[in-house]
Amino acid sequence: MLKFTEEHEWLKIEGDVATVGITNYAVDQLGDLVFVELPEVGATFSKNGNAATVESVKAASDVYCPLDGEITEVNPAIVADPSLVNSDPQGAGWFFKLKLANPADADGLLDEAAYKELTA
């Protein structure tokens, strides 16, 4: 199941784990990324907590945790090469995996149609 937030994060949810990254729209707004800081594995976040930071040639921006949960994995490839986020934001450019405290909370996020409407 693919979900989106109004803060331009995407979530690919499989069971009680969500892979999280930033959307194509966010990447377009930021420009070329030059730095990514990810959370620690095992860290817990509340919804909308500041989980990661990205810096681009234009600005620095926070990446928010879309739902309550615990970080189970991070993507070290994007720390070594932030351009992966630019080239494949919803694939190889994922940020972290989040074990959801309450998977049903994902129902309150945007579906693809609603997100496209938000960014139109």
From Swiss-Prot:
Top-level lineage group: Bacteria
Signal peptide feature range: none
Role noted for this protein: The glycine cleavage system catalyzes the degradation of glycine. The H protein shuttles the methylamine group of glycine from the P protein to the T protein.
Organism of provenance: Rhizobium etli (strain ATCC 51251 / DSM 11541 / JCM 21823 / NBRC 15573 / CFN 42)
Gene: gcvH
GO biological process, one term: glycine decarboxylation via glycine cleavage system
CDD domains tied to this protein: GCS_H
Cofactor note: Binds 1 lipoyl cofactor covalently.
Record-linked InterPro entries: 2-oxoA_DH_lipoyl-BS, Biotin_lipoyl, GCV_H, GCV_H/Fam206, GCV_H_sub, Single_hybrid_motif
Swiss-Prot/TrEMBL cofactor(s): (R)-lipoate
Modification sites for N6-lipoyllysine: K58
Alphabetized NCBIfam families for the sequence: gcvH, PRK01202.1
Subunit architecture: The glycine cleavage system is composed of four proteins: P, T, L and H.
Domain spans labelled Lipoyl-binding: 17-99
Protein's UniProt name: Glycine cleavage system H protein
Any one GO cellular component localisation term in the record: cytoplasm
PANTHER family: GLYCINE CLEAVAGE SYSTEM H PROTEIN (PTHR11715), GLYCINE CLEAVAGE SYSTEM H PROTEIN-RELATED (PTHR11715:SF3)
Keyword tags: Lipoyl
Family: Belongs to the GcvH family.
